[in-house]
Structure formats: C-alpha cells, structure tokens
Amino acid sequence: MTANITKSPRPLKITIVGDGMVGKTCMLITYTRNEFPEEYIPTVFDNHACNIAVDDRDYNLTLWDTAGQEDYERLRPLSYPSTNCFLLCYSISSRTSFENVKSKWWPEIRHFSAHVPVVLVGTKLDLRIPNSEKFVTTQEGKKMRKEIHAFNLVECSAKKKQNLQQVFEEAVRAVERKPKTTSKQSCKIL
C-alpha cells in the first residue's frame, strides 16, 4: 500500500529593494492582486503573500516591500534577515536608480546578507523609448547583472502586466539553483 503524500508549499521570503518611486510597490500589488494602483503612496514597510508553482513545485511567497527613501536607511535592513532572495529593482526610465544599483543597493544587501541570491529587475518597461539615451537599455541591464553577479535580469511592466510572472519565477529559481560542479577531480593530500 502506498500513501499519497502531498508536499506542502515551500515558504520563501523575497525582499524587494531599490530607489523610491521605481515601481516596487506597483509591481507587487499588480502581481498579487491583479490590479495596477494608479495612486502613488510611499511605502515604509509592507508585506504581500501569494502562491506560485515553478518547475513542478509549489511555493508560498512572502513578499517584503521596503522603502527606498534615505529616511528609512536604518530601518530597512531590519527586513533583511531570513530573506531567501532579493529583487533588486531600478526603473528603466531613471538612470539614477540604475546607477544606485551598484553604488548603493548592491553594497547594502551584500553587507547584511552576503550569500543571498539576487534577481535584477528593470521596472517600467512600458516607458522605454527605443534609441533614447534617457532610458536604460537591456544591454546595460545585462552588463550590470554580470557586474553584480545577479542570478538573472528581468525587465517588466506592472502597468502592462508584462513579465511579472517571470520576475517571481526567477526569484524562486535563484533560491533553488544548484551549485555548478567545475571539476570532477577529488582533492588529494600527499
């Protein structure tokens, strides 16, 4: 006789960081409630939850929305413990937010959570105008992903509901990734 055992969803904590007004909260609300918030309300801290299936496994995501404003620099790191993955966000329409990925956010999350995987997220994809120097290009995003050793880059639009599912699937995959074996030779002590 075999028992039919159903695995319960694996809980994961995903913490979202980035400059204020890059669209972190809109991304979370649109993803979890399937509605785009038209009004901007600055976030101090907020939590959202949802279930997701990735690669034939169920997960329960707790999504921690953090404040990007400098006023909350001392409070924000209190949300970092037990994080399984960071979504490091910048707005495709803001070069300053993109530059802050490397100068502010990457150093901050590495200081508090050195080995937690990161998915780099370019928000407000719907605003990009091709061949405009004002906007961050996909190539620049890919280069930044390599420089900060992020698991992946996903560009999305909360307003158009474009690539939102992929953002959270990649966060789960970043947590579940297996270390790559570079050599099959064993260590020998002589």
Curated annotation (Swiss-Prot):
Protein's cellular compartments: Cell membrane
BP GO annotations: actin filament organization; border follicle cell migration; cell chemotaxis; cell projection assembly; cortical cytoskeleton organization; establishment or maintenance of cell polarity; hemocyte development; hemocyte migration
GO molecular function (one): GTPase activity
Disulfide bonds: none
Main location: membrane
Modification type Cysteine methyl ester: residues: 187
Name of the protein in question: Ras-like GTP-binding protein RhoL
Family membership: Belongs to the small GTPase superfamily. Rho family.
Membrane topology: Lipid-anchor
Extent of motif Effector region: 40-48
S-geranylgeranyl cysteine lipid modification positions: 187
Known tissue expression: Highly expressed in the embryonic cephalic mesoderm starting from stage 6 and fading by stage 11. Hemocyte precursor cells.
One cellular-component annotation, GO: cytoplasmic vesicle
Lineage of the species this protein comes from: Eukaryota, Metazoa, Ecdysozoa, Arthropoda, Hexapoda
Residue sites binding GTP per the record: 18-25, 65-69, 123-126
InterPro entries (alphabetical): P-loop_NTPase, Small_GTP-bd, Small_GTPase, Small_GTPase_Rho
Gene: RhoL
Pfam family, one: Ras
Annotated signal peptide: none
Maturation-removed propeptide residues: 188-190
Description of the deletion phenotype: Hemocyte precursor cells start to differentiate normally, but never develop into mature hemocytes.
Organism: Drosophila melanogaster (Fruit fly)
Function per UniProt: Essential for the maturation of hemocytes.
Alphabetized UniProt keyword annotations: Cell membrane, GTP-binding, Lipoprotein, Membrane, Methylation, Nucleotide-binding, Prenylation
